[in-house]
Each structure stands twice: as structure tokens, then as C-alpha cells.
């Protein structure tokens, strides 16, 4: 093998992957794990895997550390922004934690984000459960005649959304008038 051509090939590959990473960051604002998976998939698809996985992994790690050093990637900031966005959508804290874990965020950043949410809002799970009931038209948003018939179904929907039994029971026990007053406060 010719070391000079290998060096040129290595530099071309690094430049191509760095360009792909920058364009992806510009478009999507991903976490470190997401950009790593994206670059690996692009390498396998575009360059047909001409190098060993260890070499490619090193190249991708170098690119990611360089991007992180230049403040293009920041998992703490990513975790905070995603957690707030999920909370606005009506996710429970459990579902937020699970979603951030699936995005590849480490436990320390997840804990910090959840603590910030708890400090900013009093009982964020209750507020999110109210939003979920409004969005899915369950619990207090159902007609009074159907509420008892659909009680178990509504409990199941809230449980699958990540809310605890106490919060679900409290929400489903609210009257429609009380619920609407609470919605105005949100």
C-alpha cells in the first residue's frame, strides 16, 4: 500500500464527514449520539465501508470532539431544550427521561434538565396530565354520561403516557368546570 495515497484518502474522508456533520448540525441540532449514528450510516452508504470500523469510529469521534470543542455540539443544552419542548407537548417527566435516554443523552444531563424543570414549575406532571387530557379529550373533557364507562380506558391512556396512579386519579376526579378553570391558568 502506498502511504501517501492512503493519507490523501484519509484526509478526503475526514473532510467529507466533517462537511456532512456540519450540514446535519445546521439543519437538525442533534445530540452527540445522533450525529455519530448519522455519520456512520452516511459512511457505510456513501463510501461502501472501505476502512475498518475502528478507524472510522476514531475519525468520527475526532470530528465530534472537534465540533464539541468549537461549541457546535452541546448535550447539556440539547437536553434542556428537548426537555422543555417535551413538557410543552404534555409529556410526563418519566416519558421525558425515556425520550432523552433514547436520544443518547447521558444520565447526568438528564437529571440536571429534570431538576431545572422541577425548580421552574410546581408539579409539572399534573400540568402535563391536564394538557394530555385536553389533547386526547379524555377524563373531564368527556361528556358526564360517558365518564364512568371510560374510566379504566382513561386511566390506561394516562398510564401509557407515563403518569402515576395518584395524578391520573386526581385528574379524572376533576369536574369539567374545575378542569376548564385550571386550563385558563395554564
Question: What does each model-found stretch correspond to?
Answer:
Residues 1-186:
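An alpha-helical, amphipathic repeat domain used for nucleic-acid recognition
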Amino acid at each position: 500500500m502506498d502511504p501517501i495515497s492512503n493519507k490523501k484518502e484519509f484526509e478526503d474522508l475526514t473532510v467529507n464527514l466533517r462537511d456532512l456533520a456540519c450540514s446535519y448540525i445546521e439543519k437538525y441540532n442533534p445530540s452527540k449520539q445522533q450525529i455519530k449514528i448519522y455519520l456512520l450510516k452516511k459512511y457505510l452508504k456513501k463510501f461502501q465501508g472501505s476502512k475498518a470500523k475502528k478507524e472510522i469510529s476514531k475519525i468520527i469521534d475526532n470530528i465530534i470532539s472537534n465540533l464539541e470543542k468549537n461549541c457546535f455540539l452541546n448535550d447539556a443544552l440539547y437536553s434542556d431544550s428537548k426537555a422543555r419542548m417535551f413538557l410543552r407537548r404534555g409529556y410526563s417527566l418519566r416519558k421525558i427521561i425515556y425520550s432523552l435516554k433514547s436520544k443518547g443523552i447521558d444520565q447526568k444531563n438528564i437529571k440536571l434538565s429534570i431538576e431545572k424543570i422541577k425548580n421552574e414549575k410546581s408539579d409539572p406532571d399534573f400540568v402535563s396530565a391536564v394538557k394530555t387530557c385536553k389533547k386526547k379529550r379524555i377524563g373531564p373533557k368527556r361528556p358526564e354520561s360517558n365518564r364512568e364507562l371510560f374510566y379504566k380506558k382513561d386511566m390506561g391512556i394516562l398510564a401509557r403516557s407515563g403518569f402515576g396512579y395518584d395524578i391520573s386519579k386526581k385528574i379524572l376526579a376533576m369536574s369539567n368546570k374545575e378542569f376548564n378553570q385550571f386550563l385558563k391558568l395554564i
